[in-house]
Amino acid sequence: PQEQDPDMLLHVVKETDAGIVVRGAKFETAAAYSNQAFVKPTIGGWAGNEKLSDYAVSFICDMGAPGLKHICRSGFSGRGSVEDYPLANNFDEVDTLLVFDNVLVPWENVLFYRHTSAAAFIRATLHRYSAYPFVTRIRYVADMMIGAALFNARQTGLDKHQAVREKLAMLACYREGINAHLTASIALAEKSPGGL
């Protein structure tokens, strides 16, 4: 995509005494209700590609920075009572497209810049640390969905039908698959090179 429109992906456009100036877009989960975001590089194929070095940037960004625009989808919560919409009101998560229009990032907030090997490393290892809380959260969402499905089936009397029981059992299997991944990540955990 950067060949089609070089300003589409987040990249550095200039360097100043105060910091770096960035332009482009980046998705960040929870940016809509955060004070700051850990902005990471997007591109995956960094290996020795110096043409992409302007895209090899990571920093902490204030969500109210001048030139930063937030484009969010509408939330599902608040469209009705918690009793009528338990999933939407309890498990909604808003992803945000951040559009950086010449945003100044102070040097003290820059984690790395024009460092393709750091960008490759962070893209390769990031999910090692973010997957655990994600899977933990998804397990609770699965519990809520199974509960809602079972409640609905019992209220309508459909829980007596074999086909419905099979679907409920399949939901339970999916939930247990999530739990198995979480359990394995704990049981098979290894220290990272940085000691985490």
Spell out what each predicted region is.
Residues 10-11, 28, 49-50, 87-91:
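Short Gly/Pro-enriched turn/cap motifs at secondary-structure boundaries
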Residues 16, 33, 55, 92-99:
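A generic structural signal for well-ordered coil/turn residues at beta-strand boundaries
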Residues 25, 29-80:
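A short core secondary-structure module
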Residues 179-196:
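C-terminal helix-coil-helix/basic helical segment that borders enzyme active sites and/or dimer interfaces
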Residues 19, 36-38, 58-60, 97-102:
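Conserved hydrophobic/aromatic beta-strand scaffold that supports enzyme active sites
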Residues 11, 72-75, 82-89:
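Short Gly/Thr-rich strand-loop-strand
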Residues 1-23:
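Gly/Pro-rich turn-and-neighbor structural signature
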